[in-house]
Amino acid sequence: MWNGLTDDYHPTQILADFLTLQEHFGRLRGLKFVYVGDGRNNMANSLMIGAAKMGMDFVLDAPSQLWPSEELVQLCHSYAAESGGSITITDQPDAVEGADVIYTDVWCSMGEEDKAAERVKLLRPYQVNRELMERTGKKETVFLHCLPAVKGNEVTEDVFESPASLVFDEAENRMHTIKAVMVATLGRQE
């Protein structure tokens, strides 16, 4: 059985994300990976786990009302201690400083449409826009999003369509990584 997506986790997406970063940077270990937005959704949970296991410096920048469970954070701290990575949970705008990667996801997950207006108001300060990208202090910072994106909410069109955006490479890599999972798990090839 494969977990393609649940309310809590999205592991196959993380494989595509990390392949995209490996292709772009040539490494994962030591990258500063900042997730901005709803910090308790399936993408934030899975990215934090994956980044912790791969030795990345993971920063979750979200309003405290949308932080992940303390149990998951502690588990990820233990993974990071083993891999040489780190986990930081914050609500501060300067969290993006020095980021190699900025990642966001939709502000209103599937099944939460009734909370859309409240989420937009709460998360507006966490929008990935040109100003946020400039606050990284790096011209080489890349942008990722698992798609589909609501341009104008979690990310502005100018960032989404910019050279920093690797979202289409990331989307293509979903096909390759999911095929790899299938080949690796469907049984022995004769």
What are these regions (language model features)?
Residues 1-22, 151:
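Phosphate/diphosphate ligand-binding glycine-rich loop within oxidoreductases
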Residues 77-157:
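Rossmann-like adenosine-cofactor binding region
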Residues 5-9, 63-66, 171-174:
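Short, acidic/turn-prone active-site loops that include or flank metal/cofactor-
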